[in-house]
Amino acid sequence: MKKVNLIIASLLSWAIMSVSALAVDIIVVSHGQANDPFWSVAKNGVDKGCKDMKISCKYTAPATFDMVEMAKLIDNAVSQKPKGIVITLPDAAALGKSVKAAISAGIPVISMNSGSDDYMKLGISAHVGQTEFEAGVGGGQKMKAAGGKKALCVNHEVGNVALDRRCAG
């Protein structure tokens, strides 16, 4: 939890450095719903980081894992002209057009969690997260060290390219 809060605070700090106004509006568009056990920690980190830094933030996510809906949420965020947008990037091909529209509008974009392999190709300013393939390799090594001989990687979000890469590791 502390690590997630630190990552979110770092993301927000970086976004703030690129704008001059005191009242900063940051929109977070995630593929993970705030009621999911993992993503609730991330949302709480966003909320705490924004409160601590005295900025306004909005966390949005599709009701289910849905790249078309997520692209619409990014487009909607762009139309609100925030000072910065933080996104997850589970599928660069599906979200690329929307991300590039944000950047073309002069809005700083940072990715978190997923997207380490693709964020630079889209022009995203920075990424906070692990490289997916290497994370999968590390997970496999830990399982082997614990005595595991076989593994099954289940991708619970069909279409999440980042998880496909992790399973490949």
Where are these regions (language model features)?
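A residue-level marker of the well-folded mature domains of exported/periplasmic proteins
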Residues: 2-5, 16, 21-169
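Sec-dependent N-terminal signal peptides
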Residues: 6-12
